[in-house]
Amino acid sequence: GTEVAVDTLRNGRFFFEGMTGSNEVEEYDVMAKDYGKLPPVWLSLWIGPDTHLKVKGENKLLKTWRVEGGSECQRFQQQLVDASRKELDAFQQSTMESMALGQALQNASGEQRESIIAKLKQTQDEQDSLQRCVMANDIRLMKQSVVNKVWMNSLDGLGKMLKYDKEFPYRNEVKELYESLPDEWKNTEEGKSVYTALYPPVVVKDGEMAADGDLYDLQGKVHHLSDFQGKYILLDFWSRGCGPCIQSQPELKEISELHKDSLEVVSLSIETKKGWEASVKNHPLAWNNWNDLQGRNGIAARYGVNGIPHFVLIAPDGHIVKSWVGYGPGLLKVQLRRWMRPQPQTVYGTHEGNPTVDYPAYETSNADALQITQVERTDSATILRIHAYYIPKFWIQLAKETHLVADDGTKCPVLRTEGLSLGKHFYMPESGEADFTLYFAPLPASVKTFDFMEGDGNEAWRINGIRVVE
């Protein structure tokens, strides 16, 4: 979103005044900037021309401060808050606890680190449970209420949870609410988003042929990705409210010029036409600047876009080479250097009589920054040689609990390392590439596959099903 006003709390009071973006009622969110002092949530205000609201809060739980006055939309927003006040207050308290634990985790190690991770999981489970209670309360109230913008906003939120949460328990209720809508509400951006969540398109994956569609420039001319067949394409899904998206634009410009003979950069806005036109006034793009005018429900849904910036590298023959999410200075150059070249093949061999596998195949990985270049098995150790790719001058870290797990369940701890120290920040060089070696206790002689595990937490890096035999 865009910051429209700032005030400081003085003597228990704050005041905002400004011009609305249109004659329609729109959502504005009040947030606090004091990290750790107030929960990382927002208070929703629905504001149109000549709207006057009074906000009252008697604690730090911003999301449940009471709002008086305003339109039908604001009154329904307050009804939603009142219906779940107990759960929302508990949720905000829990997020404060999570923030404190997250701060403590940065300097923790060993058993203390594991204890904090366990507590973080417990608070996350509490928050998930509370969120589901809130959703159930929302659904009950929505079934009894007239549809308005806040109603649709709530339905859209339920649709997003359905999209992201594989165990979402209210799919049937969301479908029932959606099916009850008149066509005029189904055809809104929120209505289309909920439809996409209920009936998602097939998402194209790395290695598959790229999805295409009608893509419009600012003059209304239609383009297609297939127009660039024979060249690499770097797709950039973005919006003006995404800080890293804007931060990436100078590097995208540099890349578009550096690789102009072999690669086309295509920035695809996921905003409305109005928002897109406004965004390029402040952030003009000198390369392909397109939009399918379907928000997250068109080509973005085909590529599984959730967070942004979301990048997709497409090969000259039209297949997807690699997709990734997020940005840091220099990362795009690192990624193109890595993926715009022939990929190394798996080779089985020996080194001084020990079995080796160069660039071993694996089943799944959440550790895109790590590429295992060789596995060597000796009588005294299993050796992993790793090449890392990451944001230049940023750090990566492997936990002291990093280990291997053989296909028979044998756990092999780290014996020693070369090139980095476990449990400590390793800052990447300016190239964004680095090599290091990990020595683990030997895997069983009969092993066919094993897993690399940085730890047991949900956020730990894992590479599963690493194959060491043909």
Language-model features: where?
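A non-transmembrane, solvent-exposed segment enriched in polar/low-complexity residues
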Residues: G1-E126
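N-terminal "domain-start" segment that seeds a small globular fold
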Residues: K192-L225, L285-N288, R341-P344
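Conserved redox-active cysteine motifs that mediate thiol-disulfide chemistry
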Residues: Q229-G230, F237-E254
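Structural microenvironment flanking redox-active thiols in thiol-disulfide oxidoreductases
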Residues: I246-H283, Q294-A301
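Short, internal strand/loop/helix patches
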Residues: V280-D317
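Thiol-/selenol-based redox modules, centered on thioredoxin-like
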Residues: P316-P344
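Short, well-ordered beta-strand segments enriched in hydrophobic/aromatic residues
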Residues: A381-Y390
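Short, solvent-exposed, Trp/other aromatic-anchored flexible loops in extracytoplasmic proteins
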Residues: P413-G457
